[in-house]
Amino acid sequence: IKDLIKHLPEWSTPRCYDRSVLTLFSRGYLVPQPYGVVLVIGTWNYPFMLTLMPLAAALSAGNVVVVKPSNVSPTCSKLISRLLREYMDPT
């Protein structure tokens, strides 16, 4: 998460690309934009980390996230569900 916070301004700024022979009279820009809706499917082997890290990355990019915790690890799934309800806006 510290790496995400550190590099987020760099990742979200528009970038200009060099011109080539084919694009001599034009400009090329890459403008990062959110995907929209992201589905994060949790795994059973590292359910907490492999659910919350993609969740943090998708939220920081401006996406709406749907989280589906693993049903193989029910205790971690309940904990993740409870924490997300407590600290996140469900709407």
PLM region descriptions:
Residues 20-91:
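Rossmann-like NAD(P) dinucleotide-binding subdomain of oxidoreductase/dehydrogenase enzymes
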Residues 1-14, 24-29:
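Long amphipathic alpha-helix in the N-terminal Rossmann-like dinucleotide-binding domain
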Residues 15-19:
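Short, flexible loop/turn segments with low-complexity composition
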